[in-house]
Each structure stands twice: as C-alpha cells, then as structure tokens.
C-alpha cells in the first residue's frame, strides 16, 4: 500500500514528446529541469489524476501514446483545468492505448491511498488519503542487475518476444512477436508478428503479420498480412493480405488481397483482390478483382473484375468486368462487360457488353452490346446491339441492332436494325430495319425497312419498306414500300408501294402502287396503281390504275384505268378505262373506256366508250360510243354514237350519232349525231354535239359540244363544249368547255374549260379552265385553270391554275397555281403555286409555291415556297420555302426555308432554313437553319443552325449551331454549337459547343464545349469543355474540362479538368483534375488531381493528388497524394501520401505515407509511413513506419518501424523496430528492437533487443538483449542479457563488459549449459 503516491494519465506524441518538448521514457523516471511550483501548464509536468477529469488537453491524434505514471502526492499542484495536476517529476509505469491505460489504472488503484484534496502553494499540497485494499503488481523498471531473473511459467515450446505494454498468449509451438501495446493470442504451431497497438487472434497452424493498430482473427491453417489500422477475419485455410485501414472477412480456403481502406467479405474457396477503398462480398468459389472505391457483391462461383468506383452484383457462376464508376447487377451464369459509368442489370445466363455511361437491363439468356450512353432493356433470350446514346427495349427472344441516338422497342422474338436517331417499336416476331432519324412502329410478326427520317407503323404480320422522310402506317399482314417523303396508311393484309412524296391510305386486303407525289385512298381489298402526282380514291374490292397527274375516285367493286393527267369518278360496280388527260365520271355499274384527253360522264347503268380527247356526258341508262376527239352530251335514257371529232348535243331521252367533225344542235329530249367538221345550233334547253371543225350557235340556257376546230357562239346562261382548236364566244354567265387549241371568249360571270393549246378571254368574275398549251386572259376576280404549257393573264382578285410549262400573269389579289415549268407573274398580294421548273414573279404581299427547279421573284411581304432546284428572290418581309438545290434571295425581315443544296441570301431580320449542302447569306439579326454541307453567312445578332459539313459565318451577337464537320465563325457575343469535326471561331464573350474532332477559337470571356478530338483556343476568362483527344488553350481566369487524351493550356487562375491521357499546363492559382496517364503542369498555389500514370508538376503551395504510377513534382508547402507506383518530388514542408511501389522525394519537415514496395526520400524532421517492401530515406529526427521487406534510412533522432525482412539505417539517438530477418543499423544512444534471425548494430549508449538466432553489435555503455542462438557484441561498460529457455521457463543471463572476463568488442553466445562463451571464429 502506497500512501504518498498517486497515478496520473496523459498523452504524448508518437515520439513520446509532450507539448513542452520533453521526451518521456517508455518506462522509468522523467523530470522537468525548469520546474516552478505555480499554477498553469508551463514549467512542469502535467496529468489527469486517476484518469478522471477534462479531456480537452489530451491529444486526439490517432498515433498519440497514452502514458500512466506514478507521482509523489506531496509534489502535486492542482491547476485550473478540472482533474489536472502539475508535478516536477514522475515514474512511467505504462505506455499504450486509451483502453490499456485505463485498464492499468483500474487494476492498480487499489494499491494506493487516493488523494482527495490538494492545495496549491510553494510548500506542497495537503493530502488527505483514503486507503483501498488490494494487491499490487510491480511496475516495469529499467533496473539492471547482474543476476538471473525468473520469468513466468510458459507452455511447452512457445516463443514470445514482446516489447513494453504488450500482451501475448500462445499455445503449443507457437511464435509471437509483438510491438508495444499489442495483444496477441495464438493456437498451436502458429506464428504472429504484430506492430504496436495491434490485436491478433489465430487458430492452429496460422501465420499473421500485422501493421500497427490492426486487428486480425484467423481460423486454422490461415495466413494473414495486414497494413496498419486494418481488420481481418478469416476461417480455416484462408489467405488474407490487406492494406492499411482495410477490413477483410473470409470463409474457409479463401484468398483476399485488399488495398488500403477496402472492405472484403468472402465465403469458402474465394479469391478477392481489391483496390483501396473498395468493398467486396462474395459467395463460395468466387473470384473478385476490384479497383479502388468499387463495390462488388457476388454469389457462388462468380468472377468479377471492377474498375475504381464501380459497383458489381452477381449471382452464382457469373462473370463481370466493369469500368470505373459503372454499376453491374447480374443473375447466375451471366457475363457482363461494362465501360466506365455504365449500368448493367441482367438475369440468369445473360451476356452484356456496355460502353461508358450506358445502361443495360436484360432477362435470362440475353446478349446485349451497348455503345456509350445507350440504354438497353431486354427480356430473356434477346440479343441487343446498340450505338452510343441509343435506347433499346425488347421482350423475350428479340434481336435489336441500333445506331447511335436511336430508340428500339420490340416484343418477343423480334429483329430490329436501326440507323442513328431512329425510333423503332415492334410487337413479337417482327423484323425492322430503319435508316437514321426514322420512326417505326409494328405489331406482331411485321417486317419493316425504313429510310432515314421515315415513319413506319404496321399491324401484325406486315411488311413495310420506306424511303427517307416517308410515313407508313399499316395494320396486320400488310406489305408497304414507300419512297422518300411519302405517307402510307394500310389496313391489314394490304400491299402498298409508294413513290417519293406520295400519300397512300388503304383498307384491309388492298394493293396500292403509287408514283412520286401521288395520293391513294382505298377501302378493303382494292388494287390501286398510280403514276406520279396522281390521286386515287377507291371503295372496297376496286381496281385502279392511274397515270401520272391523274385523279381517280371509285366506289366499291369498281375497275378504273387512267392515263396521265386524267380524272376518273365512278360509283359502285363501274369499269372505267381512260387515256392521258381524260376525265371520267360514272354512276353505279357503268362501263367507261376513254381515250387520252377525253372527258366521260355517265349515270348509273351506263356504258361509255370514248376515243382519245373525246368528251362524253350521259344520264343514267345511257349508251355512248364516241370516236377520239368527239364530244357527246346526252340526258338520261339517251343513246349517242359519235365519230371522232364530232359534237353531239341532245335533250333528255335523245339519241345522237355524229360523224367525225360534225356539229349538232338539239332541243330538249333531242338526239343529235354529227359528223366531223359539222356545225350545230340549238335553242334553249338543247343539247348539241358537233364533229370536226364544226360551228355551233345556241340560245340562252343551251348546251353546246363542238368538235375539233369548231366555233361556238352562245347567249346568256349558255353552256359550250368545244373540240380541239375550236373558238367559243359567250355572253355573261356562260359555261365554256373547249378542246385542244381552241379559243374561248366569255362575258362576265362565265365559266370556260379549254382543251390543249386553247386561248380563252373572259370578262368579270369568269372561271376559265384550259387544256395543254392554252392561253387564258381574264379580268378582275376571274378563276383560270390551264393545261400544260398554257399562258394565263388575269385581272385583280383572280385565281389561276396552270398546267405544265404554262405562263400566268395576274393583277391585284390574284391566286395563281401553275404546272411544271410554268412562268407566273402577279401583282401585290397574289398567291402563286407553280409546278416543276416554273418561274414565279409576284408583287408585294404575295404568296408563291413553286415546283421543282422553279424561279420565283416576289415583292414586299411575299411568301414563297419552291420545289427542287428552284430560285427565289423576294423583297422585305418575305417568307421563302425552297426545295432541293434551290437559290433564295430575300429582302428585309424575310423568312427562308430551303431544300437540299439550296443557296439563300436574305436582308435584315431574316430567318433562313436550308436543306442539305445549301449556302445561306443573311444580314444583321437573321436566323439561319441549314442542312448537310451547307454554308451560312449572317450579320450581327443572327442565329444559325447548320447541318453536316456546313460552314457558318455570323456577325455580332450571333448564335450558331452546326452539324457534323461544319466550320463556324462568329463575332463578339456569339453562341456556337457545332457537330462532329467542326471548326468554330467566335468573337468576344462567345459560347461554343462543338462535336467530335472540332476546332474552336474564341475571344475574351468565351465558353467552349467541344466533342472528341477537338482543338479549343480561347482568350481570358473563358470556360472550355472538350471531348476525347481534344486540345484546349485558354487565357486568363479560364475553366477547362477535357476528355480523353486531351491537351490543355490555360492562363492565370484557371480551372482544368481533363480525361484520360491528357496533358494540362496552367499558370498560377490553377486547379487541375486529370484522367489516366495525363500530364499536368501548373503554377504556384495550384491544386492538381490526376489519374493513373499521370505526371504532375506544380508551383509553390500546391495540392497534388495522383493515381497509380504517377509522377508528382511540386514546390514548397505542397500536399501530394499519389497512387500505386508513383514518384513524388516536393519542396520543403510538404505532405506526401503515395500508393504501392511509389518513389517519394521531399524536403525538410515533410510527412510521407506510401504503400508497399515504395521508395521515400525526405528532408529533416519528416514522418514517413510506407507499405511492404518499401525503401525509406529520411533526414534528421524523422519518423519512419514501413511494412515488411522494407529498407529504411533516417538521420539522427529518427524513429523507424518496419515489418519482417526489413533493413533499417538511422543516425544517433534513433529508435528502430523491425520484424524477423531484418537488418538494423543505428548511431549512438539509439534503441533497436527486432524479431528472430536479425542483425542489429548500434553506437555507444544504445539498447538492442532481438529474438532468437540474431546478431547484436553495439558501442560503449550499451544494453543488448538476445534470445537463444543470438550473438552479442558490445563496447566498454555495456550490459549483455541472454534470454534462455530451460524447457519450463525463461531465464535472463546478464553480463557486463569489463567484468567477469567479459571483454569489450568481442562476440559472445550461450552454450548448452547457459554459459556465456566466446563465439568461435568461422
């Protein structure tokens, strides 16, 4: 019982220094040379009495040492902080962890009379003691006696080597070597080597090697090797290797290799390899390899390989390979390969391969291959192949292949092939092939093939083939083939073939074949064949064959055959056959056969046979037979037979038979038959039919039909029909119909219809219809319709429709529609529509629509729409739309839309939209949109959008968006967005976004974003984002983000983020983040983070973080963190942390942390921590901590800690701690501790401790402690202690040089009788 002593608790640094710089011993007396008995922490030693009170003065560092010391009660002074006392001297009894220190105080407090009151003062405190019963263990002392001391009884054949504060428990034939403060428990035939503060528990036949602060638990026949602070738990036959701070849990016969900070959990027979910070969980018979920060979870028999930051979850017998940042979830027997940032989810037996950033979800036994950024969802037994950015969704047994940006959705057992940007939706057992930008929707069992930009919709068992830009809609069992720009709609089991620009609508069981620009509408089970530009409408069970430009309308069960430009209208059950340009109208159950250019009109149950160019009009139950060019008009119940060119006019129930060229005039119920060239005259209500060259004159309300070259004159309310080359004259409210080459003159409110080459002149409010090559002249508010090559002239408010090659001239408020190759001229506010190759000229406020190759010129506020290859010229405020290859020129505030290869020129405030390969030129504040390969030039404040390969030049405040391979040039304040391979040049304060391989150049305060392989150049204060392989150059205060392999150069205070293999160069105060293999060079005050294999060079006060194999070079006061195999070089006062195999060089006062196999070189007063197999070189007063197989070199007052097979070299007053098979060398006044089979050499006044079979050599006044088989050599006045095992316990044999025949500098050993003898010379 000690009545005058108390126990205190305090903390010291890892090197046992307190806050005042006093070095506390590991055991024994410590005294303050500057003691002053006054309150305060200065000038004395301090501690917590009995460990109770405020913990604020205690150190919270992870490597802080807890010290328990004995203090005289009469020397203690209470200070202000609760529980803390001050004293001049103390005796250290215990050094360890927080738990071990508190346990020591708890177990030994009963040996002391507690001090309950303390009074401060120079005379010492007044102590009132309270006695407590108990036994006391002797404290560890530093006393040295030349006597034999007995140890505690040990189990048979157990070897324990422990430093201060450690606890060892071993069974039969176990070997335990522990650093200070460690706790080890081992079964039979086990070997444990632990650093300070570690805890090891092992079953029989196990091997454990642990760094400081680690915790190890192992079953039988296990092998564990752990870095500092790690936790390992393994069952029988496991092999665990862990980096510092890692956690490993393994079942029987498993193998785990973990990086620092990683977590591993494995069942039986597993193999796990984890990077630092990763998490692995595996069932039995699995193999997992993980990058740093990744998470892996696998069931039985799985094989997972993951990049850093990835997440992998797998069922039994699966194989997963994941890029960094990817997420994988797989059922049993699945195979997944994922790019970085991708997400994969698969059920049993699936095979997934995904690019970076893609998402894959698959059912059982599916195969998915995805480009980067794509999304795939598949049912079982499916096969999906996707381009980048595409989306695929498939049910069971489907096969999908998609281009980039496409969307595919399919039912079970479907096959889809999609171009880029296309959308596909298919039911089960469907086949789809889509061009880029197309949309396909199909039900079960359909087959769709679509060109780019087309739309396909199909029911069950349908087949669709679509050209680009076409739209197809089909029900079950349909077959559709469409040209570009066409629209097809079909019922089930229909067959449609469409030319470009055609429109088809069909009921079930129909067959439609359409030329380009044609329109077909059919009910169920119809058969339609149409030429280009034709229009067909058919009821059920009808058959229609139409030439180009023809119009067909038929009810059910009808048969229509039409030549080009003909018009056919039939009721149910009719049979019509028409030549080109003919017109056929039939009632139900009628039969019409018409020659080209003929017009046939029949009531129900009629039969009409017409020659070419003939005109037939019949009531119901009539029979008409006409030669070519003849005109027949009959009311109901009439029977007319006419020769070619004849004209027949008959009243109701009349019968007319005319020879060719004859003229017929008949009243009501008349029958007229005319030969060729005849003249017919009839009063009111009469019906006349005339032959060739005939002349017809009729009263009011008459109806005249004339043959070729005939002349007709009719009064009020007359109806005239003339053959080819005929001349017609009619007063007000007349209706005129003329044949080829005819001349028609009509008064106000007249209606004229003219044949080919006819000439028509009409008064006010006239309606004119002319055949091919006709000439029409009309006053105000006339309506003109002309055939091919016709010429039309109309007054104000006229409406003109012209055939192919026609010429039209119209006054104010006119509406003109022209056929192919026509020429149109209109005054203000006219509306013009032209066919192919037409020329249109219109005044202000006109609207023009032109066919292919047309030329349009319009005045103020005009709207122009032109076909392919057209040329458009418009004044201010015009709206122009042009077809392929067109040229557009517009004035102020114009809007232009151009087709492929068009050229556009627009004035101020214009909006231009151009097709492929177009050229656009616009003034200020214009809006331009261009197709592929187009060239755009715009003034300031313009907005440009360009297609592939386009070139854009814009003025001030412009916005440019360009397609692939485009070139963009913009002035200040421009916003540029470019496609692949584009080149962008922008003025001041511009924003640029560029596609793949683009080149960007921007002025001050620009924002640049570039795709793959792009090159970026920007002035000060720019923000650059670049894709793969890009090169970025930026001015002052720039922010750069670059993709893979990019090169970045930035001005002052820049922020750079680069992808894999990039090169970065930045000035002062920059922040750099680089991907794998990158090279970063930054100015002072920079922050650099680099990926694997990178090389970093930075100025003063920089912060560098690098991936595996990187090289870091930095200025003073830098903080460097590097991955595996990296090389670090830094200035003074730097902190370096490196991964495995790294090489570190640092200046004075640096702190270095490295993984195994690293090399460290530092200045004075540095702290180095290295992993297994490391090489460490440090300056004066350094602290070195390393794993096994390390080489450590330090200056004076250094502290070295290493595992087995290490080499340690240090200066004077150093402390060295190493495992088995190590080589330790130190200067004077050093302390060396090592395991078995070691070599220890030190200078004068040193202390050496080693295990069995070691060699210890020291200078004068040293203390040497060795176990069995060791050799001790010391200088003068030294102590030699041999620890001997006699089969029951350890005994210490102590000797001093210079006494008892022990000479200095001579090697000594113990013989079999525990006698100290000279080592024989070898």
From Swiss-Prot:
Record membrane topology: Peripheral membrane protein
UniProt-listed InterPro entries: Ice_nucleatn
Region (Disordered), start-end ranges: 271-303, 327-358, 372-399, 423-448
Region named Octapeptide periodicity: 162-1281
Claim: Repeat is one of the keywords in the record: yes
MF terms in GO: ice binding
Residue stretches in coiled coil: none
Subcellular location: Cell outer membrane
First-listed, main subcellular location of the protein, grouped into a coarse class: membrane
Protein purpose: Ice nucleation proteins enable bacteria to nucleate crystallization in supercooled water.
Domain remark text: Contains many imperfect repeats of a consensus octapeptide A-G-Y-G-S-T-X-T; further on a 16-residue and a regional 48-residue periodicity is superimposed.
Record-stated family: Belongs to the bacterial ice nucleation protein family.
Record's protein name: Ice nucleation protein InaA
Gene it is expressed from: inaA
């Amino acid at each position: 019982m000690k009545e005058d002593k108390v126990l205190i608790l305090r903390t010291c640094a890892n090197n046992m220094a307190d806050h005042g710089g006093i070095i506390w011993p590991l055991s024994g007396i410590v005294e303050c040379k500057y003691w002053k008995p006054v309150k305060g922490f200065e000038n004395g030693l301090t501690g917590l009495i009995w460990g109770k009170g405020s913990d604020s003065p205690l150190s919270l560092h992870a490597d802080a040492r807890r010290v328990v010391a004995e203090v005289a009660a009469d020397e203690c002074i209470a200070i202000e902080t609760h529980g803390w006392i001050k004293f001049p001297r103390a005796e250290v009894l215990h050094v360890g962890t927080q738990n071990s220190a508190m346990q020591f105080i708890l177990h030994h407090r009963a040996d002391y009379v507690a001090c309950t009151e303390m009074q401060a003062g120079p005379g010492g405190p007044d102590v009132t003691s309270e006695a407590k019963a108990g036994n006391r263990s002797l404290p560890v002392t530093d006393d040295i006696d030349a006597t034999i001391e007995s140890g505690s009884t040990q189990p048979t054949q157990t070897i324990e080597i422990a430093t201060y504060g450690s606890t060892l428990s071993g069974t039969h034939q176990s070997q335990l070597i522990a650093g200070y403060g460690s706790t080890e428990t081992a079964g039979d035939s086990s070997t444990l080597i632990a650093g300070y503060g570690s805890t090891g528990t092992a079953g029989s036949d196990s091997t454990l090697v642990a760094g400081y602060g680690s915790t190890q638990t192992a079953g039988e026949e296990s092998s564990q090797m752990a870095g500092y602070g790690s936790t390992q738990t393994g069952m029988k036959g496991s092999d665990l290797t862990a980096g510092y701070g890692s956690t490993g849990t393994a079942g029987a016969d498993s193998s785990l290799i973990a990086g620092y900070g990683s977590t591993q959990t494995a069942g039986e027979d597993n193999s796990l390899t984890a990077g630092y910070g990763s998490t692995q969980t595996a069932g039995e018979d699995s193999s997992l390899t993980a990058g740093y920060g990744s998470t892996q979870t696998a069931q039985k028999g799985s094989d997972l390989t993951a990049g850093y930051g990835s997440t992998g979850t797998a069922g039994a017998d699966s194989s997963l390979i994941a890029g960094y940042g990817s997420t994988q979830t797989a059922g049993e027997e699945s195979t997944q390969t994922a790019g970085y940032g991708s997400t994969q989810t698969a059920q049993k037996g699936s095979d997934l391969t995904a690019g970076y950033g893609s998402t894959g979800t698959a059912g059982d036994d599916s195969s998915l291959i995805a480009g980067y950024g794509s999304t795939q969802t598949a049912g079982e037994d499916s096969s999906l192949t996707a381009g980048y950015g595409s989306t695929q969704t498939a049910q069971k047994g489907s096969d999908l292949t998609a281009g980039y940006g496409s969307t595919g959705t399919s039912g079970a057992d479907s096959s889809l092939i999609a171009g880029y940007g296309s959308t596909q939706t298919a039911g089960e057992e469907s086949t789809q092939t889509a061009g880029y930008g197309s949309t396909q929707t199909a039900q079960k069992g359909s087959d769709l093939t679509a060109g780019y930009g087309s739309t396909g919709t199909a029911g069950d068992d349908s087949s669709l083939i679509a050209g680009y830009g076409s739209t197809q809609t089909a029900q079950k069992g349909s077959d559709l083939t469409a040209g570009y720009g066409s629209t097809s709609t079909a019922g089930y089991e229909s067959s449609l073939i469409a030319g470009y620009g055609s429109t088809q609508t069909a009921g079930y069981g129909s067959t439609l074949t359409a030329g380009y620009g044609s329109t077909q509408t059919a009910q169920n089970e119809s058969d339609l064949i149409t030429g280009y530009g034709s229009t067909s409408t058919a009821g059920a069970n009808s058959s229609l064959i139409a030439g180009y430009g023809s119009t067909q309308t038929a009810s059910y069960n009808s048969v229509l055959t039409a030549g080009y430009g003909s018009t056919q209208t039939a009721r149910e059950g009719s049979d019509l056959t028409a030549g080109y340009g003919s017109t056929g109208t039939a009632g139900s159950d009628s039969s019409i056969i018409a020659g080209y250019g003929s017009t046939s009109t029949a009531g129900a149950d009629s039969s009409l046979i017409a020659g070419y160019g003939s005109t037939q009009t019949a009531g119901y139950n009539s029979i008409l037979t006409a030669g070519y060019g003849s005109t027949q008009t009959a009311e109901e119940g009439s029977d007319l037979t006419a020769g070619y060119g004849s004209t027949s006019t008959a009243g109701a129930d009349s019968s007319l038979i005319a020879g060719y060229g004859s003229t017929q005039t008949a009243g009501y119920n008349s029958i007229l038959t005319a030969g060729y060239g005849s003249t017919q005259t009839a009063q009111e209500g009469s019906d006349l039919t005339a032959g060739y060259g005939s002349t017809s004159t009729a009263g009011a309300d008459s109806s005249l039909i004339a043959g070729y070259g005939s002349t007709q004159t009719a009064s009020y309310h007359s109806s005239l029909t003339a053959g080819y080359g005929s001349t017609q004259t009619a007063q007000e409210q007349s209706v005129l119909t003329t044949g080829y080459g005819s001349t028609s003159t009509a008064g106000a409110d007249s209606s004229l219809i003219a044949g080919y080459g006819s000439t028509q002149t009409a008064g006010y409010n006239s309606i004119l219809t002319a055949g091919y090559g006709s000439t029409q002249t009309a006053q105000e508010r006339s309506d003109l319709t002309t055939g091919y090559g016709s010429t039309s002239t109309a007054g104000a408010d006229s409406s003109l429709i012209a055939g192919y090659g026609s010429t039209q001239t119209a006054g104010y408020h006119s509406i003109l529609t022209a056929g192919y190759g026509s020429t149109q001229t209109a005054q203000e506010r006219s509306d013009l529509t032209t066919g192919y190759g037409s020329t249109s000229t219109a005044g202000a406020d006109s609207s023009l629509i032109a066919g292919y190759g047309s030329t349009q010129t319009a005045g103020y506020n005009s709207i122009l729409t032109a076909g392919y290859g057209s040329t458009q010229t418009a004044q201010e405020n015009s709206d122009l739309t042009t077809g392929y290859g067109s040229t557009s020129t517009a004035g102020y505030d114009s809007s232009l839309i151009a087709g492929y290869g068009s050229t556009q020129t627009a004035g101020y405030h214009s909006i231009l939209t151009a097709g492929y390969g177009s050229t656009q030129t616009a003034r200020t504040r214009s809006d331009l949109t261009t197709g592929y390969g187009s060239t755009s030039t715009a003034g300031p404040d313009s907005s440009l959008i360009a297609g592939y390969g386009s070139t854009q030049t814009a003025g001030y405040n412009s916005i440019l968006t360009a397609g692939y391979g485009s070139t963009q040039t913009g002035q200040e304040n421009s916003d540029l967005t470019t496609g692949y391979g584009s080149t962008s040049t922008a003025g001041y304060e511009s924003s640029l976004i560029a596609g793949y391989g683009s080149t960007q150049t921007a002025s001050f305060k620009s924002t640049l974003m570039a795709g793959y392989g792009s090159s970026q150049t920007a002035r000060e204060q720019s923000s650059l984002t670049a894709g793969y392989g890009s090169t970025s150059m930026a001015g002052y205060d720039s922010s750069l983000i670059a993709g893979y392999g990019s090169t970045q150069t930035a001005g002052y205070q820049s922020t750079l983020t680069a992808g894999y293999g990039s090169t970065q160069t930045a000035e002062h105060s920059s922040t750099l983040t680089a991907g794998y293999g990158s090279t970063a060079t930054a100015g002072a005050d920079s922050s650099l983070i680099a990926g694997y294999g990178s090389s970093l060079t930075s100025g003063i006060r920089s912060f560098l973080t690098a991936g595996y194999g990187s090289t870091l070079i930095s200025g003073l006061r830098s903080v460097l963190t590097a991955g595996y195999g990296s090389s670090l070089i830094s200035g003074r006062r730097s902190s370096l942390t490196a991964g495995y195999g790294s090489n570190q060089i640092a200046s004075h006062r640096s702190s270095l942390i490295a993984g195994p196999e690293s090399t460290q070189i530092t200045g004075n007063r540095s702290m180095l921590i290295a992993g297994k197999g490391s090489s460490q070189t440090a300056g004066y007063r350094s602290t070195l901590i390393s794993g096994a197989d390390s080489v450590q070199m330090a200056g004076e007052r250094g502290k070295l800690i290493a595992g087995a097979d290490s080499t340690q070299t240090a200066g004077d007053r150093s402390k060295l701690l190493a495992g088995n098979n190590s080589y330790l060398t130190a200067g004077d006044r050093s302390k060396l501790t090592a395991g078995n089979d070691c070599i220890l050499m030190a200078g004068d006044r040193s202390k050496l401790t080693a295990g069995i079979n070691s060699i210890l050599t020291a200078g004068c006044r040293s203390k040497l402690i060795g176990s069995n088989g060791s050799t001790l050599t010391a200088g003068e006045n030294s102590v030699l202690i041999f620890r001997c095992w006699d089969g029951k316990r350890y005994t210490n044999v102590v000797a001093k040089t210079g006494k008892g025949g022990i000479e200095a500098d001579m090697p000594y050993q113990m013989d079999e009788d525990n006698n100290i003898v000279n080592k024989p010379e070898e």
